[in-house]
């Protein structure tokens, strides 16, 4: 580097020399002798600024002095002046080079000084990656670690005497984060299963709601038929305890006053303490009560009276006794026949929906299944029992061999001649403890003994065929 500087300055001298001022020649003494210049011993060099100022002043002084003819001694003094100037330049360059080396050494020592590593919280634990080659100007934390023992694996105990460049702060949260990830994954699976289960439950709920809505849809003729049945109780616009007890006694039911009150409380749907026609209609169109009554009649005739189905039992006896007008009988039997068929189809649909849930292996609530399907699930078994009873060889009914279940009674106008109103037969009948076997002939005032009744006459929903016109 010094050689380059010297070459550069020699080239500058070549360009500067033609413009250098002429130096005065040696002075001659008065005695005719030649005066010789004396050079003082070189002392300490002044600073560069002082030298520059002195060099600027020297040419001025040289220009002010009178020029004299140059001689050989002047040429020698010019060479000495050039050599002194080059020495000054070289010394200045050496000082600047040493200056740069010293500052560079200080910067390197400052970079090599140890720094304390502070753990910084990160969003996810990651192992520190050491690059293969890092320049010297990079930060201290990115450089290669000093040669020594290999760093311990993540989470392992590190001795205090050994320097370790690995940050252990994020590694402490690794266990918690694993538990959090497991918890999130379990929540996702549960939410996915729940999301798949909700459409099935909603479909079941909609099916059940549609069934409940269809119960309220009655035609005008059907409503008038149920009103005719309601007027039999002869109450003051409602069914009270006295009227209900009188009808039960006429039908041969032996009930207590507590059972009558329970039946009225069950029929009071709106809870106002009165059983008006609206409550009566809601009870008679209730699908659950209807199927419960059908099941009780199919199982046993000696079953205890159910207060929730007592009105159905009274209606069953009135239909079998032909104690209602012909149009009323036809509308009521057609209504319950349709309800029985719809209940059977809906029970099959409900079973299919539950089967799909089981095939998909999704958890479902069995209690909810029982509460929503108990009446409908037993329809098929009830029908099979009714068929077995109808086809039994010991039955004497002429309708025992009918291959299908029809719910409308056979009304032959030529054989059965009823009076315009047969309520008088109920008014004349007052025996409270009549046997079921003699109950039917007691109400044969208009049929002249042409109809036969047996002990199974209460099963009118399954034993009587439909009317043909």
UniProtKB/Swiss-Prot annotation:
SMART domains: EFh (SM00054). Residues 105-132 have a biased composition (Polar residues). PROSITE patterns: EF_HAND_1 (PS00018), EF_HAND_2 (PS50222). Residues 146-157 have a biased composition (Pro residues). GO terms for molecular function: calcium ion binding. Ca(2+) binds at residues 268, 270, 272, 274, 279. Changing residue 24 to S: In a breast cancer sample; somatic mutation. Residues 255-290 form the EF-hand domain. Residues 49-61, 450-459 have a biased composition (Basic and acidic residues). Residues 62-73 have a biased composition (Low complexity). Transmembrane segments: none annotated. Involved in the differentiation of haploid spermatids. This is Spermatogenesis-associated protein 21. It comes from Homo sapiens (Human). The gene is SPATA21.
């Amino acid at each position: 580097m010094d050689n380059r500087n010297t070459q550069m300055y020699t080239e500058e001298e070549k360009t500067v020399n033609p413009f250098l001022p002429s130096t005065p020649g040696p002075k001659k003494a008065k005695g005719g002798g030649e005066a010789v210049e004396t050079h003082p011993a070189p002392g300490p060099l002044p600073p560069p600024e002082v030298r520059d100022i002195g060099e600027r002043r020297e040419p001025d002084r040289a220009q002010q002095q009178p020029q004299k003819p140059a001689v050989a001694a002047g040429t020698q003094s010019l060479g000495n002046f050039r050599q002194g100037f080059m020495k000054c330049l070289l010394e200045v360059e050496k000082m600047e080079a040493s200056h740069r080396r010293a500052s560079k050494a200080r910067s390197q020592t400052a970079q090599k000084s140890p720094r304390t590593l502070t753990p910084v919280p990160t969003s996810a634990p990651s192992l520190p990656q050491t690059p293969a080659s890092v320049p010297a100007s990079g930060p201290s934390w990115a450089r290669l670690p000093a040669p020594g023992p290999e760093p311990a694996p993540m989470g392992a105990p590190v001795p205090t005497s050994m320097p370790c460049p690995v940050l252990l702060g994020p590694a402490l949260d690794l266990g918690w984060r694993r538990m959090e990830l497991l918890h999130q994954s379990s929540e996702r699976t549960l939410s996915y299963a729940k999301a798949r289960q909700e459409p099935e439950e909603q479909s079941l709920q909609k099916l059940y709601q549609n069934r409940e809505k269809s119960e309220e849809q009655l035609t005008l003729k059907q409503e008038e038929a149920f009103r005719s049945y309601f007027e039999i109780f002869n109450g003051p616009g409602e069914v009270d305890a006295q009227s209900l007890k009188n009808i039960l006694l006429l039908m041969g039911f032996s009930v207590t006053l507590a059972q009558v009150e329970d039946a009225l409380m069950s029929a009071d749907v709106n809870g106002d303490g009165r059983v008006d026609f609206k409550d009566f209609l809601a009870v008679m169109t209730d699908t659950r009560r209807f199927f419960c009554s059908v099941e009780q009649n199919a199982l046993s005739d000696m079953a205890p009276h159910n207060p929730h189905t007592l009105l159905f039992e009274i209606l069953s006896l009135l239909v079998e006794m032909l104690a209602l007008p012909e149009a009323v009988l036809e509308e009521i039997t057609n209504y319950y026949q349709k309800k029985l068929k719809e209940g059977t189809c809906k029970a099959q649909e409900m079973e299919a929906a539950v089967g799909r849930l089981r095939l998909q292996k999704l958890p479902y609530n069995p209690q909810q299944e029982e509460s929503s399907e108990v009446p409908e699930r037993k329809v098929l078994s009830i029908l099979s029992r009714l068929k077995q009873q109808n086809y039994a060889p010991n039955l004497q009914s002429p309708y025992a061999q009918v291959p299908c279940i029809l719910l409308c009674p056979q009304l032959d106008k030529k054989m059965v001649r009823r009076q315009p109103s047969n309520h008088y037969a109920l008014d004349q009948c007052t025996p409270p403890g009549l046997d079921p076997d003699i109950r039917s002939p007691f109400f044969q005032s208009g049929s002249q003994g042409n109809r036969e009744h047996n002990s199974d006459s209460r099963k009118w929903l399954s034993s009587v065929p439909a009317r043909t016109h």
